[in-house]
């Protein structure tokens, strides 16, 4: 069995295609996992979808046929041609897939290295797949190690100190444009995590924030959480507010643009629209007074961020590498379990037969049979303890073959485990 990861990110796929690939809607995510799971070669799968990436992580029997099936499933659901997906996708297998997963969880593969949102998004994607029975023990164990790795990266590096997200980069861009934005007012559309982060960064810069959301109760709740610099307005005020204020940040989960040319009025002051949603919320024409920044337009600030964090990222990648090795060593030790079980079953079988013979021949009283069984089993348990420990330390093919030959047992094993440590 093999781990595979198919990745579409800001590195290999433009925002227009990423919009089509988005699985952030639960119904859509459920459907892609259903299509993927229809292939008998794919035992487990999960789908991660954020503004900067779409990832499918799977545990499969045959890598090549599974990868083709996954790409074909995405093509069927999104109508993006198979060839276009195949051309763009970064594909990782086995050790590469686990290393990539750990790097993603540790925010080393993010548009903004060190941003803290990705861990929560990954946990949510895993929980969704687990609750819907699309993944089991093999992806669960990988995710457990991934979150452990991410925690170690946060603890041993400064890469996530002063947390940075796409939302904070958008606010940083506004500061770059205006200098001091304290005292200004900004409209934030949406009440989800990205909107909340944008609003919080604006308030930290002493900007008055107006929250607009289709669900007015959510807008009201968020405004209350943010404090006295935050207020809210009903969604039917959207057109009025985006034509009144200079700073507009939008991060809704809408499937189509909510700000279009039809609701834009001509004004004689500069307005800056920050579209931090995927799919995009804003589809308007720019002119001398209207400026639009989408997720991909923020890469210049992100590159600066990368340069500042390069040394810490190097340390973090070292942790990811060690965690990847530790994961496969753990998998290998778990792979020794069938051998240990086979030895103990063999010992138990022999003990039971010999005790029965002893009873039949009169060497052992029938009333003492249970106590004798317990004693013999304890002896075998003690005898097999050291071999069991040694097997977990080095579960090599030669040792397993020798055990099969010497004790006449059959050991079921995963041929792929040891190869990942070479």
From Swiss-Prot:
Task: List the catalysed reactions.
Answer: (S)-4-amino-5-oxopentanoate + tRNA(Glu) + NADP(+) = L-glutamyl-tRNA(Glu) + NADPH + H(+)
The family database entries (InterPro entries) matched by this protein are listed as: 4pyrrol_synth_GluRdtase, 4pyrrol_synth_GluRdtase_dimer, 4pyrrol_synth_GluRdtase_N, GluRdtase_CS, GluRdtase_dimer_dom_sf, GluRdtase_N_sf, NAD(P)-bd_dom_sf, Shikm_DH/Glu-tRNA_Rdtase
Pathway note:
Porphyrin-containing compound metabolism; protoporphyrin-IX biosynthesis; 5-aminolevulinate from L-glutamyl-tRNA(Glu): step 1/2
Q: By its UniProt entry, which Pfam families does this protein fall under?
A: GlutR_dimer, GlutR_N, Shikimate_DH
User: What domain of life is recorded for the organism?
Assistant: Bacteria
Amino acids binding NADP(+):
190-195
| Keywords associated with the record | NADP, Oxidoreductase, Porphyrin biosynthesis
Entry annotated with the keyword NADP: yes
List the active-site residues. Answer: 51 (nucleophile)
What does the entry's domain section say? Possesses an unusual extended V-shaped dimeric structure with each monomer consisting of three distinct domains arranged along a curved 'spinal' alpha-helix. The N-terminal catalytic domain specifically recognizes the glutamate moiety of the substrate. The second domain is the NADPH-binding domain, and the third C-terminal domain is responsible for dimerization.
Q: Which NCBIfam families does the record associate with it?
A: hemA (TIGR01035)
Listed HAMAP family: Glu_tRNA_reductase
Q: What name is this protein filed under?
A: Glutamyl-tRNA reductase
Taxonomic path:
Bacteria, Pseudomonadati, Campylobacterota, Epsilonproteobacteria, Campylobacterales
């Amino acid at each position: 069995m093999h781990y595979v990861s198919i990745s579409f990110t800001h590195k290999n796929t433009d925002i227009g295609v990423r919009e089509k690939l988005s699985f952030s809607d639960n119904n859509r995510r459920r459907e892609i996992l259903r299509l993927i799971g229809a292939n008998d070669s794919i035992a487990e799968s999960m789908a991660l979808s954020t503004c900067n990436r779409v990832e499918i992580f799977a545990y499969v029997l045959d890598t090549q046929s599974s990868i083709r099936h996954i790409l074909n499933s995405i093509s069927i659901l999104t109508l993006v041609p198979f060839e276009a997906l195949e051309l763009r996708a970064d594909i990782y297998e086995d050790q590469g897939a686990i290393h990539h997963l750990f790097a993603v969880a540790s925010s080393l593969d993010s548009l903004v290295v060190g941003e803290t949102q990705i861990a929560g998004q990954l946990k949510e994607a895993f929980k969704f797949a687990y609750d819907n029975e699309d993944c089991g023990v093999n992806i669960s164990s990988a995710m457990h190690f991934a979150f452990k790795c991410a925690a170690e990266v946060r603890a041993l590096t400064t890469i996530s100190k002063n947390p940075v997200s796409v939302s904070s980069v958008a606010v940083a861009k506004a500061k770059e444009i205006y200098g001091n934005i304290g005292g200004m007012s900004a409209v934030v559309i949406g009440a989800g995590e990205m909107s909340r982060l944008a609003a919080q960064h604006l308030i930290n810069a002493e900007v008055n924030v107006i929250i607009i959301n289709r669900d007015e109760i959510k807008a009201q709740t968020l405004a209350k959480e943010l404090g006295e610099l935050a207020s809210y307005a009903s969604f039917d005020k959207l057109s009025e507010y985006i034509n009144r204020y200079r700073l507009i940040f939008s991060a809704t989960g809408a499937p189509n643009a909510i700000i279009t040319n039809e609701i834009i009025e001509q004004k004689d002051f500069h307005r800056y629209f920050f579209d931090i949603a995927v799919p995009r919320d804003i589809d308007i024409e720019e002119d001398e007074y209207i400026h639009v920044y989408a997720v991909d337009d923020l890469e210049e600030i992100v590159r600066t961020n990368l340069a500042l964090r390069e040394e810490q990222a190097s340390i973090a990648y070292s942790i990811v590498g060690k965690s990847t090795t530790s994961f496969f060593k753990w998998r290998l030790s778990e792979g020794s379990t069938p051998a240990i079980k086979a030895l103990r079953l063999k010992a138990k079988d022999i003990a039971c037969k010999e005790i029965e013979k002893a009873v039949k021949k009169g060497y052992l009283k029938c009333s003492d049979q249970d106590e004798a069984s317990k004693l013999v089993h304890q002896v075998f348990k003690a005898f097999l303890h050291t071999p069991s420990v040694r097997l977990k330390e080095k579960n090599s093919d030669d040792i397993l073959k020798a055990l099969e030959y010497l004790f006449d047992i059959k050991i079921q094993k995963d041929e792929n485990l040891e190869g990942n440590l070479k």
